[in-house]
Amino acid sequence: DKWQMPQGGVEPNEPLLMAMKRELEEETSIKNVKVLKEFDQWLEYELPENLIGKIWKGKYRGQKQKWFIVKFTGEESEININTKQAEFIEWKWIDMNLLPNLIVAFKKNIYEDILIELKKYVN
């Protein structure tokens, strides 16, 4: 099994910050966060050949992503992944250093880049 952090698409004309907050709430019910950092750069990955045409209805070959570092300021009781269109089957807090090894291999480089930035904000 592989893990990933919440993520999602941006609606037409939707500001990136609003998209991040909307996706976070849609996927986890989390509303209470403090934004610490919007990544300056976009992060990208390509799907491996064996997945091209098999996921995302065959429309895409990869993704370009804008990431945010946020601090959860709510109570754990507000976290609910059993949402209308549930995308996760489980959640947990982990040591951030484990992130790159828990994600699917083709996203590992992105998670390594995220970890570099994240370490600047976490004691």
Task: Annotate the PLM regions.
Residues 96-123:
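Charged phosphate-binding loop/patch that engages nucleotide di/tri-phosphates or the phosphate backbone
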